Amino acid sequence: MISFNLKLYNNNMNLDFSDDQKFLQDEAKKFFDKEGGLSNARKVMDNSLEGDKDLWKKIIELGWTGIRVPEAYEGLGLGHLELCVIAEELGRSLAPVPFSSSVYFFTEAIIKFGSEEIKSDLLPKLVSGEAIGTYGIAEDMHPATESNLTVSVTSEKINGIKIAVPD
């Protein structure tokens, strides 16, 4: 028989949000409750819309698209907990906006892996809403080939076909 005597946490560990994080959570909850919540998501789904562009503009104005972007690139420079607070409230309301793909997938990848040139170019555009980011995910079962991956690029947008592109 094996016995373990592990002390995982000390008695002084506080896992609560800070006062600032609680304030952010309350403000986000009020914001998403006011902006329509589930009824707004249903409207977008029922009308086959791409998303709620007005809601996305308001999220941009609040600066939440730059919540994790360093201040040097025009973001708020906050941490992952603040990002999670916003993401949790956004998910609770089923807000039909490209927050997950653009803010915590694409933007995080640029922050972590982008060159200084790419960061300087893209991060301010992601914060301001001038750009929305996502990426095409490579699948083991369906590798990208000329037959299942097409793309065209204009000065305004990228258009194409690819399996598994978030948002």
How would you label these PLM feature ranges?
Residues 16, 68, 105, 136, ...:
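Conserved beta-strand segments that form the floor/walls of ligand-binding pockets within enzyme
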Residues 2-100, 121, 125:
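Amphipathic, small/basic residue-rich leader segments at the start of a protein or domain
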Residues 51-53, 107, 111, 143-148:
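Short, solvent-exposed polar/charged micro-motifs at secondary-structure junctions
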Residues 75-76, 117-167:
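Glycine-rich, Trp-frequent "lid" loop and neighboring beta-strands that shape
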Residues 27, 35, 89-90, 103, ...:
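Fold-independent oxyanion-binding glycine-rich loops
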Residues 95-117:
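N-terminal glycine-rich flavin-associated loop
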